[in-house]
Amino acid sequence: MKKEIKRDDVNVIEKDFGNNNSIILKLFKKFGEDSFFIQTTVTDIIVLWIDGSLLLALAKFLLTINNPYNMLFDLYGIDERMRLYKHNLPLSHFSVVYHFISINRNSDIILKIALLEEKLSLPTLTKLYPNANWYEREIWDMFGISFENHPNLIRILMPKTWVGHPLRKDHPARATEFDPYVLNKYKEDIEMEALKFKPEEWGMKKNKQSKYMFLNLGPNHPSAHGAFRIILQLDGEEIVDCVPDIGYHHRGAEKMGERQTWHNYIPYTDRVEYLGGCINEMPYVLAVERLAGIEVSQRIEVIRIMLSELFRINSHLLFISTFIQDVGAMTPVFLAFTDRQKIYDLIELITGSRMHPAWFRIGGLAHDLPKGWNALLKEFLLWMPKRLLKYINVALKNSILISRSKGIAEYNKHDALLWGVTGAGLRATGINFDVRKKRPYSGYQNFDFEVPIGAGISDCYSRVMLKLEEIWQSLAILKQCLENMPEGPFKMDHPNTTPPHKVRTLQHIETMISHFLKVSWGPVLSSNESFKMVEATKGINSYYLISDGNTMSYRTRIRTPSFPHLQQIPSVIRGNLISDLIAYLGSIDFVMSDVDR
């Protein structure tokens, strides 16, 4: 395969990839330089195109080297057929992207495989990385790319009766592009039949000595935390096996990114994980700013952090209180909603909205901080510590809660990495990986805070207690924001993001023309690929954006933490009781919009 950077130009490799160049040299030595095409992007990640025949050998190599790339962070497809600016990339109609992370190295590597329409097929990675299962099903569902020897390659987000593959460029993006939908008795029977669970399709076989029951938990069960179904194979109350069934909340968030301008997509980011608010806006605007070459002021960075930590506390309070409710105590829910109201009052004062502010902007913020924000924040910082002690004393030290959650739904660091677990679930296993510390963004490196780490085993109780500790750390960050808010602009003076100053419009007609085009059409960003991850409320959230020199994204990939977390459920809960499953679901901290997108 053609190379963009030659092996003997080590200086170029070091300049582009810094400390990560060692893995490139190892790959060159093992597989030969001609096996790779190095793509230059603004992702700050090694991006290598390879032939599909090398995939299994390369993945095994990455998984078994010293300090291995033992997390398959993301896996997704791209329809390359309408892409204008390919920059001499390998010929492809579609491509499949594998994003690996080495926690020990704090390093990423992305492998891309070019596919032609005549052969849309690759070998499955499920035997090496078990979390590839759902990602490969999603690629089949969205693009029609198959994976050889996959254990059960069926749709995952779309209904079984759906026709077509939605993320292909020739698939309609709007409801008005379809024929009018009519639901008659015949169609209803077909849809209901498609929802029936058939155990034999999943390799679930009856034992002659045991009479198993198959039970639907959800998609409207209160302990399922949303439109989510788990099919349980039961021997009495013991869970022999289970199959999580998702997709009921799918709204096509990635497809929408292909139809909205760079600015207009911001409100959609809030709704991917509807409790995270501004945290969800952060990776998107940072990725777009990287594409546009925009650097923001320190004031913007600190305000973004302040809003993110307010939403983090807000989400954690809901998680902790509803977990306690799931195992049998009601009082903390009422305490939490009182505390969350105080946070929403502050968020509403600053942004004008509550749950979905859509307040971050490319290159800044919607507006500056209002008068009185600091007094309200100070009041909250005085209030919250006393309330946290109440949660601990009233519920989290309760012997019944501890017995219902400690030692329940356990997994270790090896399993967490192979299943793609991030956030508190990963840190509870003893792995110290918080993006705010390991890969600081928006100025987090200037703040003094600790990352709570578990003792080595992640169980229901440790996951909850880590989230509680994270609230204390978020309060410490907010205090620093209050005491050290820098001066400066709330929006950068950049033609792609900000209207020109009045004085310039009276002197230079070009500024008016530029303003008219940027407002009416949207900003045009140069062709490139960008990536940004953040430590969100439920784990690592990231955006991979492809610009094709247009006013909107060519491909918007949203990696959410809850998707792999739900995929892990069967491996953790087999052999446990139904009551343990309820506690486990409550300890994951997920919302279905984050899973289904």
From Swiss-Prot:
- Known EC number(s)? 7.1.1.-
Q: Which domain of life is it from?
A: Bacteria
Is this entry keyworded Repressor? no
Say which enzyme class the record assigns. Answer: translocase
Reaction(s) catalysed by this chain's protein: a quinone + NADH + 5 H(+)(in) = a quinol + NAD(+) + 4 H(+)(out)
Membrane topology per the entry is: Peripheral membrane protein
Q: Into which family does the record put it?
A: In the N-terminal section; belongs to the complex I 30 kDa subunit family.
Q: By what name is this protein known?
A: NADH-quinone oxidoreductase subunit C/D
UniProt organism field: Buchnera aphidicola subsp. Baizongia pistaciae (strain Bp)
